[in-house]
């Protein structure tokens, strides 16, 4: 996807402790970066506020990392996230990790596809997503630059 396909963006600097002996970000850290992206994305969406105190707990069912180019220590990166599907008990969210370029050009380093299942923590079994979940993420994601352009053209 293009940067304009995402309403949510968050940037941060890669710490030396996140790199390995090869001088690049250690492979497991890509999932840490996806977790940061999803945490900040949900905060931006105000997801927990909509829950009105109800427990909204999720387990990651599947995480797929697709690597494109290395990330180096002390580099600024930008993570983007959006919801690409909602099911009866789960959400699929896409995270893109880019090098943060001065001109805003695409510098895709990796993508992470996450399937998260809404669970009852007492029994660790899937439970249905509340009806409002899809609408909250759809409304937020529709603020993406490319989404607004598509809506204006329609």
What role is predicted for each listed range?
Residues 1-40, 44, 154:
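Catalytic strand-loop segment that frames the active site of acyl-thioester-processing enzymes
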């Amino acid at each position: 996807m293009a940067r304009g396909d995402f309403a949510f963006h968050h940037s941060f600097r890669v710490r030396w402790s996140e790199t390995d002996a090869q001088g690049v970000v250690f492979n497991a850290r890509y999932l840490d970066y996806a977790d940061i992206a999803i945490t900040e994305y949900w905060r931006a969406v105000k997801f927990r506020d909509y829950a009105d105190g109800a427990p909204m707990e999720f387990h990651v069912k599947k995480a797929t990392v697709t690597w494109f180019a290395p990330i180096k220590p002390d580099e600024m990166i930008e993570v983007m996230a959006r919801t690409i599907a909602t099911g009866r008990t789960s959400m699929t969210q896409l995270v893109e990790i880019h090098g943060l370029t001065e001109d805003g050009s695409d510098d895709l380093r990796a993508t992470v596809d996450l399937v998260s299942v809404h669970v009852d923590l007492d029994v660790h079994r899937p439970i249905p997503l509340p009806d409002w979940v899809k609408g909250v993420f759809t409304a937020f994601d529709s603020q993406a630059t490319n989404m607004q352009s598509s809506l204006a053209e329609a």
